[in-house]
Regions:
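Extended, well-ordered protein cores
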Residues: 1-251
Length: 251
């Protein structure tokens, strides 16, 4: 097929598109990216040895590329479809984390590239958590949450069709890839309108705020992106007018 595109290229386009979308949803995040870029530049100007080390490792070009995002899903079926989606981008589940040990009712994995060449091209990963409804002790509330999740559709019909097309054909044209990225983004877009009534939301929130966040909205919105900084202490010690408060939007 002419004009096919690689998984690395799709992942790169997706990570850039997700960053742009998140900056629209959380304008403070764009300010954070500028702040981190300024700090990184200052660090490199004052540390020629580090600059040379990163240049020799071919890291300079990727310094301002986000490395990490995080999402939460509600059902095993949603997770299975995400696995298919991320595979198109060359991202595969790595490791297992049982966060219930820390009082968080999820278990998690990280979808990321796994071979050296793919990591060198674009190391973007998405930490993905699956809600554990069995940890809701109130049976009626647990069944209500299960029913809500069973009704929701977090993937657009066109996204599902493109996933199936890729699995059948093994490749995308550039046009297919662009459409796929745009359709995939809809799964991770923030929605202000909940899908439940106020009483249900508060009941789930009392059980755990994360349960309400997962169950009560129509998608698995990206809950944070993480830029790479060479000096986290300097970023956090910036003058007060520049500092971004997490509760204002960046989780």
């Amino acid at each position: 097929m002419a004009n096919t595109i690689t998984a690395d290229e799709i992942r790169e386009h997706f990570s850039q598109a997700m960053s742009a979308m998140y900056q629209q949803e959380v304008p403070q995040y764009g300010t954070l990216l500028e702040l981190v870029a300024d700090v990184n530049l200052a660090v490199l100007e004052n540390n020629p040895q580090l600059h040379e080390q990163l240049a020799n490792a071919d890291e300079l070009a990727r310094l301002n590329v986000e490395r990490h995002g995080a999402i939460r899903v509600g059902t095993a079926e949603e997770l299975a479809t995400l696995r298919r989606m991320f595979a198109i981008m060359g991202m595969y589940p790595v490791s297992y984390y049982d966060l219930s040990q820390a009082g968080v009712p999820v278990h998690s994995t990280a979808f990321r590239p796994i071979d050296d060449a793919a990591l060198a091209r674009n190391p973007f990963r998405i930490f993905t958590s699956l809600l554990r409804l069995e940890l809701i002790e109130n049976r009626a509330l647990r069944e209500r949450a299960e029913a809500i999740l069973a009704r929701r559709k977090i993937f657009t019909p066109r996204c599902l069709a493109l996933i199936a097309q890729y699995e059948a054909e093994g490749e995308f044209t550039s046009a297919d890839a662009r459409e796929f990225v745009q359709e995939a983004l809809e799964t991770f877009r923030w929605h202000r309108q909940a899908t439940v009534d106020e009483e249900t939301y508060h009941a789930l929130h009392r059980e755990h705020r994360l349960i309400a966040d997962v169950v009560c909205f129509p998608g698995c919105h990206i809950n944070h992106l993480t830029p790479r900084t060479l000096d986290i202490d300097r970023v956090q010690l910036m003058p007060r007018p520049v500092i971004l408060m997490p509760e204002c939007g960046i989780e």
